[in-house]
Amino acid sequence: MSEVPHLVAVLGRGVVDADEPVVTADDLGLTRGDGCFDSARVVTSATGSARVVDLDDHLQRLGASARAMDITNPPLDAWHALVDEALATWSTPGEAVLKLLLTRGREWRSAGPTALVTITHRGPWLTPGDLGGAAAAPRTITAVTLSRGHPSDAFADAPWLLGGVKTLSYVVNTAATREARRRGADDVIFTTTDGYALDGPTSGLLLATDGALVSTPTGGTGILESLTVAAILEAARTDGVATRYELVPVTDLYTADGLWLVSSGRGPVLVTTLDGRALRTDQQLAATVARYAGF
């Protein structure tokens, strides 16, 4: 397997060798998952000029996660300077993912939080014709439903459960993805014990039904607000399309006019089968939703 282009930059140190150690053995982000992160899309032109899509929105969401966890967040200008330095060094054309990572820091020494940025190449451009590229990655997936193990209101009035917070503790998400692969599917749609759909391990949920675009609400469900879903719904409203957030029964997923898992890095990816059942896949509708998302 060829090496994937990857960059690491640490607050207070700048860009470092990607193989250089950047956290200590007692960093609470490593030992307890006590930290948060956010991810954004990076698009780099054929000449090596890189830009981050909606960086400020992702920094705001990171800040909200840090506040919910009582972690001191570096000033925005420090994050911007670190990202700018990373982008100035990054030159691999195509799509990449920027991660903003923040941990509580060392357990046995008062040294403040650990903050770093990574950029990892994902492949060719996802937007048709973008910067001379063409859509090369598959834009459809298969999925299975898996229970998240709690009801749809489990996070209401319980801020210590960290609902809606993008923590570093993603082990359940990765375990669910492995289970999907064991079942012959690409991805997962989490469900509640009272029969509603939530989101994916690394994505928001969007469906088209009765002429409207619908997504799962945050709050009591505990799901993370999807910035890309929000952008799609805003663009759809501007286009005269009805949108809403509401609890969606799992049974409604199988009869939807379209079903997508949505993330900032991949955009809206159309789900073609769910639990082995073929779904409706309107390509014109899928193209419209992709356009709403900027893909």
Model-derived segments and spans:
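Short helix-capping segments at alpha-helix termini
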Residues: 91-92, 240
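Ordered, amphipathic secondary-structure segments that act as subunit-interaction surfaces
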Residues: 92-102
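Conserved acidic
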Residues: 75
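Helix-start/capping segments and mature chain N-termini
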Residues: 1-72, 81-85, 103, 108-295
